Amino acid sequence: MAHIDPTLVGKVSSILTGRIPQAPPQEARAVVAGIRAMARRAPDIVAAVSKMDAAQLSATVPVYVLDREQWAAGTASSLGAVLGDELLSAHVGESQGGRLKALTAPSSALVSVEVGAGLALMAKSVLGQYDPLAPNADGAQVPGRLVLVAPNILEFQRAFDLDQRDLALWVCVHELTHAAQFAQAPWLRDYIISRARAMVKDATGSDASLALDSGPGGDISAIMSVLEGHAEFVMNAVPIGQLPSKRRLKTAMRTRRDNSSPWKKWLQRLTGMDMKMGQYAAGETFVSEVVKAVGVEGLNQLWDDPLNAPSIEEIASPLTWVHRVIGTDYLGRDS
């Protein structure tokens, strides 16, 4: 059985992402210190905006400020631990258009190279990531860890001449909203893992494509849309007084997402990143419509029980979810 080598995955990904932004040691240290300071501020903001009882627990999540290679290695390690090397390597082997099918047993090195190549585009783009699949740290009351990719934050800040501390805070609010979600809904981690394993297992047969509109894949698409949309909602609701350059940040982020070159858009479709962009939009619309109908407190009933998780159909019809989970008595109330 082939095993995923996170170190090799990181090295391959790093090579393919190209040069990182250069900074003198003093500036680099200041960037890292600023990112860490904003990670400490973010939990209070998440708690105030989201009104989630467990949001303050996100302050216990360990924070790692990493480079691209370290991010890719850590992501590969988490995926391998949760999905299992056997399932992950089998899917990688079968999803390459027949290239690896000719091999009865792809080597660990070959599978690791494939995974590294697959993570390369994301390694160059990701600003931060709450990783709920990482092992629990000592003393943490929430699973996982917060990862912030310093070179990418610096590159984005320079490209759009953004306030560095505001950008770091904005990213941290988004990612620690995810930590708050998992703290508020302890069932979330197993819900996602069980369906991810089932989806990948189903895709290792004759048809290696991942079904994302029905079955376990549909469940994952729906819950990921909610998680991403809710994090977008919270980060965009941070008061201007706490995030003075918020309008500039939102414009820069929108431009960054919209102005990808044709080859990059093709790669995004190939790696599934275009789906993540769609999740932001669909999920934020769902969250906004639910909040408009029943307020933030009504939305927060979503986290109470896995049966409250919306279906893929309900993502497109938020009031259908409101009727099913909350009932019609709440409709039209002040939010």
Where is each model-derived feature located?
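N-terminal low-structure segments adjacent to metalloprotease catalytic domains
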Residues: 1-79, 165, 300-335
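Auxiliary, metal-adjacent structural segments of Zn-dependent hydrolase domains
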Residues: 38-151
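Short alpha-helical functional segments enriched in proximate histidine and acidic residues
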Residues: 45, 179, 183, 234
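A short mid-domain helix/strand-loop element embedded in enzyme catalytic domains
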Residues: 138-158, 195-211
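Short pre-active-site segment immediately N-terminal to the catalytic Zn-binding motif
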Residues: 154-171
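Catalytic Zn2+-binding segment of zinc metalloproteases
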Residues: 175-192
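Acidic/histidine-rich catalytic neighborhood
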Residues: 190-231
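Pan-zinc metallopeptidase signature
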Residues: 228-335
